[in-house]
Amino acid sequence: MRKVRAIVIDDSAFMRKIISDILDNDPRIEVVAVARNGEDGLNKVIQLSPDVVTLDVHMPKMDGMQALQRIMNEHPVPVVMLSSVTKAGAEKTIQAISNGAVDFIMKPSGSISLDIRNVEDEIRKKVILASTVRVKSTQEASEEDFQSTRTVPTINREKKYRRSIVSIGTSTGGPKALQKVLTELPKDIQAPIVIVQHMPPGFTKSLADRLNSICAISVKEAVHGEILQSGTAYIAPGGFHMQVENVGMSLAIALDKSPPLKGHRPSVNKLFSSLQHIKNYNKITCILTGMGNDGTDGLQQLRLNEGSTISLAESADTAIVYGMPKAAVNAGLIDYEMSLHEIPSLIVKQLT
């Protein structure tokens, strides 16, 4: 079986050595080169054409952000960013994902993370997963935005209620998918949007802030007890489950720190299943790119107990990881499976 060929780019000799050891200890992975800065790394990527690259965010000479941009322009390969848990690190990481990185790994204790082995299983898992992703150059990705998409199917299902709520679940590749969907929704959209994106604490705030700066709608990290408003998207904070509950005639956010569900907190299952208790609302659920099957069980509960749900899933054509959508499709829970570019217009169509 062919090994996954990886390049490790980090300015710390200690981090290069330990990350290389972590990867080389997996029989499925071979580290073919290491690099101490972005410029050296770019040259080795062009020379060796690896299957995947791990890239530190903060480096001298050419930092991780500049290196990522050059790699995606000149020799696109899947990139996994390594980031610190600081606010600046989170902001840079979200920017990197938006600029083409496939995923990120959080260093437990800063740039030189002596306890990096605490996340060694995550490093191997994400590197192997990233190696299967087909990445596009920056030019290809921007051109794709303007390509025509397949005709959206006509839905022969009338709205049962006057009010609606949109819910979205996503994981790997989610920040870029959310950017595509949310930036195409109009400011006056007649529904609140609740979102679970698998992400650690700190990073969801940076994601919400970035999306808010480029979307017509408002985007914010959800706060416990706040009343949902149309035209606003609420992203579950990392480390908290998010549910929706009735408060009088309104809907409100409920956050809790109950144990992770199947390894996830926030959990898409938890969000979707909470919607079965919301009466007199049309519900539009979307499952976007992501690894695993989070969302399927919750959607099943929702559809068993609520007849006013329309379910969408991102197709394999555009999903960076076709795991979560595929699980829901295979369970027979999805009404419409479509490319990412078709989803915003269908959401709007269902709300008008």
Curated annotation (Swiss-Prot):
All copies of domain CheB-type methylesterase, residue ranges: 163-352
Q: Which UniProt keywords apply?
A: Chemotaxis, Cytoplasm, Hydrolase, Phosphoprotein
Instruction: List, for all copies, the residue spans of the domain called Response regulatory.
Output: 5-122
Any idea of its EC number?
3.1.1.61, 3.5.1.44
CDD domains, A to Z? CheB_Rec (cd16432), REC_CheB-like (cd17541)
Give the free-text PTM comment from the record. Phosphorylated by CheA. Phosphorylation of the N-terminal regulatory domain activates the methylesterase activity.
Q: What is this protein called?
A: Protein-glutamate methylesterase/protein-glutamine glutaminase
**Protein source organism:** Oceanobacillus iheyensis (strain DSM 14371 / CIP 107618 / JCM 11309 / KCTC 3954 / HTE831)
Tell me what gene encodes this.
Answer: cheB
